[in-house]
Amino acid sequence: MARFALTIVRHGETRYNKEKLLQGQGIDEPLSEMGFKQADAAGRFLSNVRFTHVFSSDLIRAKQTACAIMRNNQLSEDIKIMYDPRLRERKYGDAEGRPLSELKVMAKKAGGQCPSYTPPGGETLEQVRACAKDFFEYLCQLVMAESSVKEKSELGASGMVGIMSTDLAPFVNHNKEPTIFGESRDVTLDASVLLVSHGAYMRNWIKYFVEDLQFTFPPELKKSRELSVSPNTGISHFIVTVGSGATRKPEIQCVCINLHGHLSDIDADTSHYQV
């Protein structure tokens, strides 16, 4: 068995985000001035969270966000950011570069509706979920393999992450429960993973948790809101337990979804919206 913390962050704002234009994969827009401020704010919020692995989409808006977060981090020195195309935003094909309102018009003309409508040249929701599933399974296998190696090696302890209640304070303070670990105040995890990705992709990842892994939202969270697209640099945090049995599904504990309190001092748009 292996257990790890999973922190997922949406990239900071771009000019296209501000103007409600679809980017997808074909438009590789950098962060705006506000986007860099948001990324730094997320980095400060996560500055005392220890990460063992950092992954990011290979699109520039996500890469810049990941770099800003790690630049602010005080506990994760010399961690290489791994850029992976499986974390890219949903491809919107002919709708890329167009206003979100036009996508809705395209969907209506085709007899569909957002977000299930797939524009010409775009990815279906099933394809996006398949990417999320593939990467999550890879992540679970990676942590399991590293955990197994550490158990067999007395010299492997450096990779183990001792998570104290203070290490999770940024998240626990936003959860109604005093600790997600019950009575224990000192828990050892096998890894602490940071992912930086995109709004529609992240929503489909969480839907994969809900529909395929039977993840349930804590009672204080509204499902309809949490399945909307995260604000820019919205932060979600989970604890994942992976069993050794091939047929056993990972267990997901939710600490927070689409957290954005770190943006309160920079006048950023924190609205949730549907795509």
Curated annotation (Swiss-Prot):
One of its GO terms (cellular component) is nucleus. It catalyses: beta-D-fructose 2,6-bisphosphate + H2O = beta-D-fructose 6-phosphate + phosphate. It is found in: Cytoplasm; Nucleus; Mitochondrion. CDD domains: HP_PGM_like (cd07067). Keywords: Apoptosis, Autophagy, Cytoplasm, Hydrolase, Mitochondrion, Nucleus. The record marks 198 as: Transition state stabilizer. InterPro entries: His_Pase_superF_clade-1, His_PPase_superfam, PG/BPGM_mutase_AS, Phosphoglycerate_Mutase. The active site is at 11 (tele-phosphohistidine intermediate), 89 (proton donor/acceptor). It comes from the Eukaryota. SMART domains: PGAM. One of its GO terms (molecular function) is fructose-2,6-bisphosphate 2-phosphatase activity. The keyword Cytoplasm applies. GO terms for biological process: apoptotic process; autophagy; negative regulation of glycolytic process; regulation of pentose-phosphate shunt. It is an enzyme of class 3 (hydrolase). Pfam families: His_Phos_1 (PF00300). Disulfide bonds: none annotated. Its main location: cytoplasm. Its EC number is 3.1.3.46. Belongs to the phosphoglycerate mutase family. PANTHER family: FRUCTOSE-2,6-BISPHOSPHATASE TIGAR. Fructose-bisphosphatase hydrolyzing fructose-2,6-bisphosphate as well as fructose-1,6-bisphosphate. Acts as a negative regulator of glycolysis by lowering intracellular levels of fructose-2,6-bisphosphate in a p53/TP53-dependent manner, resulting in the pentose phosphate pathway (PPP) activation and NADPH production. Contributes to the generation of reduced glutathione to cause a decrease in intracellular reactive oxygen species (ROS) content, correlating with its ability to protect cells from oxidative or metabolic stress-induced cell death. May play a role in mitophagy inhibition. This is Fructose-2,6-bisphosphatase TIGAR.
